[in-house]
């Protein structure tokens, strides 16, 4: 069965990889793209997309109404991603979203909408399979090491901090670890923020520098030992195997799934 796909954000770095993925996959068809510019033009007319035929829409609702794609791949910004996800569900389009910034309230509201429409949706803070495994391994380790800190490192153009992956990792760890205050009970920051942000007592540190793509390490400490679990994405192609899996899986879902780990066997 051919899956007809609309891509939001095709000119971004992740969006370009998604366009290439769709073009290279026999049972995927690029039905349309959603962009801030070039309304009414064809993607093939844009530099870097020679031979890639797809109508360009600046209005997501009009795209969904006229093209009726099976799936939306959204790799845009938190604000646009939230708007596109809700619109897609209302028009019966299954969203696969790699945008971070969704709150628990957003997830709850969108889950209800997906179930009302009886269609699937997948929102994943990270589509790299290795990163998802890192999160799963961290959750396993937290049962035995309750002292933990997270360091995430990304390119200096990333808008949100901490990353969605770091927050998701902390949430998974918190599910199996008692909430606690780490470090010395009388610890004092001599420079505000030196110990990082906190999620349920878990310090999270964000690094933003040119040269990085997406990297994270989870450091556990115990008596006489430490355990470090680290994942590195050196190229945005690392995310595409997860995007492909999500597109194929969302066609068979009837609810929203948050996190790629829930669809990995």
Swiss-Prot record:
Name of the top EC class for this enzyme: oxidoreductase
Residues bound to NADP(+): 37
Pathway: Amino-acid biosynthesis; L-lysine biosynthesis via DAP pathway; (S)-tetrahydrodipicolinate from L-aspartate: step 4/4
Residue positions binding NAD(+): 9-14, 98-100, 124-127
Compartment(s): Cytoplasm
GO biological process: diaminopimelate biosynthetic process; lysine biosynthetic process via diaminopimelate
Enzyme Commission number(s) from the entry: 1.17.1.8
Binding-site list for (S)-2,3,4,5-tetrahydrodipicolinate: 155, 164-165
Keywords from the UniProt entry: Amino-acid biosynthesis, Cytoplasm, Diaminopimelate biosynthesis, Lysine biosynthesis, NAD, NADP, Oxidoreductase
Principal subcellular localization: cytoplasm
PROSITE patterns: DAPB (PS01298)
GO molecular-function term, one example from the UniProt record: NAD binding
A Pfam family that the UniProt record links to this protein: DapB_C
Active site as annotated: 154, 158
Superkingdom as given in the UniProt entry: Bacteria
Catalysed reactions listed for this entry: (S)-2,3,4,5-tetrahydrodipicolinate + NAD(+) + H2O = (2S,4S)-4-hydroxy-2,3,4,5-tetrahydrodipicolinate + NADH + H(+); (S)-2,3,4,5-tetrahydrodipicolinate + NADP(+) + H2O = (2S,4S)-4-hydroxy-2,3,4,5-tetrahydrodipicolinate + NADPH + H(+)
Gene Ontology cellular component list: cytosol
Annotated family: Belongs to the DapB family.
Entry function: Catalyzes the conversion of 4-hydroxy-tetrahydrodipicolinate (HTPA) to tetrahydrodipicolinate.
NCBIfam families linked to this entry: dapB
Protein name, per record: 4-hydroxy-tetrahydrodipicolinate reductase
Organism per entry: Geobacillus kaustophilus (strain HTA426)
The gene coding this protein: dapB
């Amino acid at each position: 069965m051919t899956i007809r796909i609309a891509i939001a954000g095709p000119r971004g770095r992740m969006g370009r990889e998604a366009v290439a993925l769709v073009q290279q996959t026999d049972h995927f068809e690029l039905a349309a793209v959603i962009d801030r510019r070039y309304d009414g033009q064809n993607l093939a007319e844009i530099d870097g997309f020679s031979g890639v035929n797809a109508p360009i829409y600046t209005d997501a609702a009009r795209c969904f109404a006229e093209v009726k794609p099976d799936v939306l791949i959204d790799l845009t910004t938190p604000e646009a991603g939230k708007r596109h996800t809700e619109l897609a569900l209302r028009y019966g389009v299954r969203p696969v979203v790699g945008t971070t910034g969704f709150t628990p309230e957003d997830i709850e509201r969108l889950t209800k909408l997906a179930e009302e429409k009886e269609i699937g949706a997948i929102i994943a803070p990270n589509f790299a399979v290795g990163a998802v495994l890192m999160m799963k391994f961290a959750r396993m380790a937290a049962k035995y090491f309750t002292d933990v800190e997270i360091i995430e490192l990304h390119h200096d153009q990333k808008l949100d901090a901490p990353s969605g992956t770091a927050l998701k990792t902390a949430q998974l760890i918190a599910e199996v670890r008692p909430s606690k205050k780490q470090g010395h009970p009388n610890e004092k920051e001599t420079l505000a923020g030196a110990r990082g942000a906190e999620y349920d007592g878990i310090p999270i540190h964000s690094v933003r520098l040119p040269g990085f793509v997406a990297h994270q390490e989870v450091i556990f400490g115990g008596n006489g030992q430490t355990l470090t679990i680290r994942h590195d994405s050196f190229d945005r192609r690392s995310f595409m195997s997860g995007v492909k899996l999500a597109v194929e899986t969302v066609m068979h879902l009837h609810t929203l799934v948050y996190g790629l780990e829930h669809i990995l066997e």
